[in-house]
Amino acid sequence: MSLQSIKYSRGSLEILDQLLLPGQSKYLVVRGVEDGWKVINKMQVRGAPAIAIVGCLSLAVEINPEDFETKKSLRQEIEGKLNYLVSARPTAVNMKIAADELITLANDLYKDEAINVTEMKQRFLDATEAMLKKDIADNRAIGANGAKAILQRVAETGAAPAGSTGSVRVLTHCNTGSLATAGYGTALGVVRQLAELGKLEHVYCTETRPYNQGARLTAYELVHEKFPATLVLDSMVAALLRAKNVAAVVVGADRVASNGDTANKIGTYQIAVVAKHHDVPFYVAAPLTSIDLAIPGGDHIIIEERPDREMTHVGEHRIAAPGINCWNPAFDVTPASLITGIITERGVFKPAELKEAITKLLES
């Protein structure tokens, strides 16, 4: 059974505090938007899909018990609070897209004279809650599409380890599983699907400094699922790809530009460079909500910078020399030229065909 990072029923929201994993499993009650903003900003919940879901559900929890006198006051509350939630972690586009969609819904309901304020609130809550089910369904589709693409490439190139009967070894970075989504996962969903098909020989996960999402969270999920897995240091990737016959690298995304440039957890770019050198396919697994067609390339993506302490300390213990300066971007941008394919719930696309393909899908 997959881990559950988000527990929700109407009027109640709890999130698994990921800062305490793997040592302690503790759920935090999110009572409203301010709590939602804080748990996102402090990275007690993280992963672009999970950020969007928790942000929007925190608003649902807040407005559920409230009685609004007018549709205008409800619309203003929705718009103001959603825009505030976007500011918690600006690089991840999913929260912005979800906010824009829900604000558009609120405006449409506001303009519909046949709908009263009570029904307007009900429909808004229904739409927000539907995000949970949709995310899990999308993740399963991403997993299926990604596993198919990897296995097809292995069959064409003969890249599977000798004697493996078609099973593959894959590398992943950061955390993209049940803890980063409503469930199942994006890049880790691809790994999960390979395992369900009996085609996963081994998965390697990076520690993912400085926040150690790989060592703390992905390793935690892999052990929980009893997948054959090995943790490696970030600095070991080149040696790993040279020595272990890895069939593919699959990572998640916080924002994908229309040309395929991809912002993901810091360290992704260098893994892509190494994968290119070793002729290992490099895949990005992300829902359509992570693709931002409004920006032409990675240079337009805002990169969040985190506090020095995340680099200089592990818990309360300082590991860096006092007085040293730090540069701590949370993400880097992998150029589209290094990406083999972008795995979505609607198919796998080469970066060069992404904009046209997604535009057609959204119009259909």
UniProtKB/Swiss-Prot annotation:
Q: EC number(s)?
A: 5.3.1.23
Matching entries from InterPro entries are given as: IF-2B-related, IF-M1Pi, IF_2B-like_C, Initiation_fac_2B_a/b/d, M1Pi_N, NagB/RpiA_transferase-like
Keyword Chaperone attributed: no
Concerning Pfam families, the annotation shows: IF-2B
Its recorded name reads Methylthioribose-1-phosphate isomerase
Annotated family: Belongs to the eIF-2B alpha/beta/delta subunits family. MtnA subfamily.
The organism sits in which domain of life?
A: Eukaryota
Compartment(s) where it occurs, according to its Swiss-Prot or TrEMBL record = Cytoplasm; Nucleus
Alphabetically, the GO molecular function entries are: S-methyl-5-thioribose-1-phosphate isomerase activity
| Function text | Catalyzes the interconversion of methylthioribose-1-phosphate (MTR-1-P) into methylthioribulose-1-phosphate (MTRu-1-P).
Q: Which PANTHER family match?
A: METHYLTHIORIBOSE-1-PHOSPHATE ISOMERASE
The upper taxonomy is: Eukaryota, Metazoa, Ecdysozoa, Arthropoda, Hexapoda
Swiss-Prot/TrEMBL keywords: Amino-acid biosynthesis, Cytoplasm, Isomerase, Methionine biosynthesis, Nucleus
Keyword Coiled coil in record: no
Native species of this protein? Drosophila yakuba (Fruit fly)
Its recorded reaction(s) are: 5-(methylsulfanyl)-alpha-D-ribose 1-phosphate = 5-(methylsulfanyl)-D-ribulose 1-phosphate
Pathway-wise, it operates in: Amino-acid biosynthesis; L-methionine biosynthesis via salvage pathway; L-methionine from S-methyl-5-thio-alpha-D-ribose 1-phosphate: step 1/6
The active site annotation covers: D254
Main localization is: cytoplasm
Q: What Gene Ontology terms describe where this protein resides (cellular component)?
A: cytoplasm; nucleus
Which residues are tagged with the site Transition state stabilizer? C174
